[in-house]
Structures are given as structure tokens and as C-alpha cells.
């Protein structure tokens, strides 16, 4: 009887997951691949001034030479929230006090006539799957912004190596729109045209905020008041320092990092609040209190007015208690 109460039959969850969710996820990954690894989308050629001091910072080297290399960043971004969600869900499921609340929020799904989907399995797939989708979506938004704007990095003129003897650069305030004036490495120059928004800032704040929202909404610590805030603030601090590192190494402008923070924050909040509903169960949010039986409710209720006799008796009782003490 208890199994039937906590079981919900669904014939569409598996087909929807295979033919809708996985197809959307595959399309998102494929689009991200085209942005990252191909030249399908050409970067907008933005003009510049030959004597612009904001674009004359020293070349910091390739991305692999950065203090936070892309390989380390992507591994940490993907592994940290995944590990937190997996450990949190497994711990919540096997602790008796929290498992009862989980069973109320998440029902056992019966697909067809024989297959059961455990709430633990569904929550892990749901939360980690949405996180992975948001990670690729953030990467797409960042690449699209960089391709459309074509904002120049602080070291652009250093790698561009414009021909200062050309007629266009002889005039101090002449704005250059031609891409042929650069004499440096074309591959490095193209990367130097992708500054806004900062990819490191957007991905790091998205991952940190998603993990922070999961920790604050799911993990309960009754014995310690500071463990959860320290963990959340430490995660957000790492994302903040990642953005500052981009500015200190002259790889991005401050505006680029701020734009990346705003983009990553918006995507994390949207997915956390509107898609996974603040990491609450699907059925716990739909439970409504049972309406009160109207037969026992009076048609009209008036406020109770205390009579003078009751007031006098209460005063006499309090004075007698004072005399006794």
C-alpha cells in the first residue's frame, strides 16, 4: 500500500528523455563544438586607434601559460558541482531523517508495467544534466558574444604589430577599420579579437553559483551554522579570483570580466530557479494543504470581547497571588 502511494505511473518519461532531452543536449554540445573548434562563425573585425594605450599591454602568452589554464579550469568547473551533487544526493537518500522528506517530494516512477525509476537516480540525472546543459549554454553565449562584438584584448596592438609607417597610422587620431594593417600571427590576432565577455569569468561564476544554490537549498546542517556559508562563500570566492586573474594578466578588460559574471549569474539563476525549482522535488511543491471542512466553519465570526467581570476576577487573582508570594 505504501509503495502504491509513493508511486507515479508514467509512460512518457523514457521516450521524452531519449527523443527530446538527449537530442537537445546533443545539439547544444554540437553548437558549442562548432564555436570552439571550427571557423564556421567568423569574428567581427573591430577597428582601433594605432596609439590606443588600452590595447598596448604586453602579450601574456598563450592560454596554456596562464596561471589558470583552460584544462585546469574546465576540469574543476565540471568536477566540483558534479561531486557536490552526487555526494549530497547519496547522503540525503541514505540518511533516515532526510530520506522521509525526499520520498514525500519525489515519487517512485513506474514506466510501463515493470520498470521503476528510483528518486535518487532521477534527481542525480536531473540536477547534473541541467548543470551540464547550462555549462555548454554558457559557453555558446560567450562565444556568440565574442564573435558578434569582436572586442579587442588589452594586448591586441602588441600581437597585431601594425605598420606604423602606413598612411593610416601616421595620423594620431585616425580610426583603423582595415584588418590588413596587422603584420603579426593571424591565429594569435584572431584570438586577440575575442575579449568580451570573458569566458573564464562566465563559466566560473556559473559553476560556483549553481553549486552554491544546491548547497543552500538541499544540504541541512543543524549542528553547525558556519560550515555551509564558508563552503558557499569559498566557492564564489574562487570564481571571483578567476575573473581577477584575467585582468591581472592583461587577458581581459574589467568590463569583459563583469560582463562574464553577469552572463554566468543570469544563466545559473534561471536554471536553478525556473528549471530545477530551487532543487526541490516535483511533487513536494505541488502538495497543497487539505481544505478545511466548510460544515464546521461558522458563516460569520466576531472578535471576542472580554467582559468587565472577567477583567475584575483576573485582577483579583493576580493580587492574591502577589500577597501569597
Curated annotation (Swiss-Prot):
Cellular component per GO, a single term: plasma membrane
Glycosylation sites: 163, 316
Record InterPro entries: P_Acid_Pase_2/haloperoxi_sf (IPR036938), P_Acid_Pase_2/haloperoxidase (IPR000326), PA_PP_rel (IPR043216)
Alphabetized SUPFAM superfamilies for the sequence: Acid phosphatase/Vanadium-dependent haloperoxidase
Keyword Glycoprotein listed: yes
Keyword annotations of the record: Cell membrane, Cell projection, Glycoprotein, Membrane, Transmembrane, Transmembrane helix
Compartmental location: Cell membrane; Cell projection, Neuron projection
Pfam families cross-referenced by the UniProt entry: PAP2
UniProt record, GO biological process: nervous system development; phospholipid metabolic process
Gene3D superfamilies for this protein: Phosphatidic acid phosphatase type 2/haloperoxidase
Membrane topology: Multi-pass membrane protein
Disulphide linkage map: none
Record-annotated membrane-spanning stretches: 11-31, 67-87, 127-147, 201-218, 230-247, 257-277
Chain's role: May play a role in neurite outgrowth and neurogenesis.
Family: Belongs to the PA-phosphatase related phosphoesterase family.
Protein name from the UniProt record: Phospholipid phosphatase-related protein type 1
Organism, as annotated: Xenopus tropicalis (Western clawed frog)
Classification of source organism: Eukaryota, Metazoa, Chordata, Craniata, Vertebrata
